[in-house]
């Protein structure tokens, strides 16, 4: 049996049996129903902005929320998850797993703003000065491709790997 299958079993088992219980205990002050029950979610540290919702952004947001920060993720695209959602094919990483991870962050109190291109929609200075963020984590990933400057790379129908995967995964484009 391959190690990947064992890792998948453990992750699936954890998600089905332990994840909700663990999230309810985070920080002793946060309960999954705090916002719905009218209780305030207490935060002990400052307010943090996370730019990008790929693997680094999601991990950072989760760790900061567990430590007591008020965290908001700013994602440029319309779907949270970054390369996990648009760059990895479904057969390698089911999108439902990524959606579950994003949902876990929401239960931790993390807020997610999609369609927010920091640098165009808002600047980092505005995040700090006008919105009161104490810290900003920039986890924007590898969004821009490096071209090889070879003949034909600018022709119609020639895509970078990132553009191809984005078109196939988010836009459901047929090639």
Located regions from the model:
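Nucleotide donor/acceptor-binding cores
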Residues: 46
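Short hydrophobic core segments
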Residues: 51, 74, 132-141
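Conserved beta-strand-loop-beta-strand element in the redox core of flavoprotein oxidoreductases
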Residues: 114-136, 171-173
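Beta1-alpha1 glycine-rich phosphate/pyrophosphate-binding loop at the start
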Residues: 50-120, 146-153, 163
């Amino acid at each position: 049996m391959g190690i990947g299958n064992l890792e998948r079993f453990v992750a699936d088992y954890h998600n089905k049996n332990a994840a909700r219980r663990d999230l309810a205990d985070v920080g002793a002050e946060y309960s999954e129903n705090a916002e719905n029950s009218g209780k305030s979610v207490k935060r002990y540290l400052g307010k943090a902005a996370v730019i990008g919702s790929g693997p680094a952004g999601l991990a950072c947001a989760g760790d900061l929320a567990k430590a007591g920060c008020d965290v908001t993720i700013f994602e440029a695209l319309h779907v949270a998850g970054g390369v996990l959602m648009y760059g990895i094919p479904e057969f390698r990483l089911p999108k439902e797993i990524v959606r579950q991870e994003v949902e876990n962050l929401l239960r931790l109190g993390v807020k997610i703003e999609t369609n927010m291109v920091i640098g165009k929609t808002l600047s980092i200075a505005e995040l700090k000065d006008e919105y009161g963020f104490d810290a900003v984590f920039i986890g924007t990933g590898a969004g821009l491709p490096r071209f090889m400057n070879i003949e034909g790379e600018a022709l119609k129908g020639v895509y970078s790997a990132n553009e191809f995967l984005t078109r196939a995964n988010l836009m459901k484009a047929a090639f």
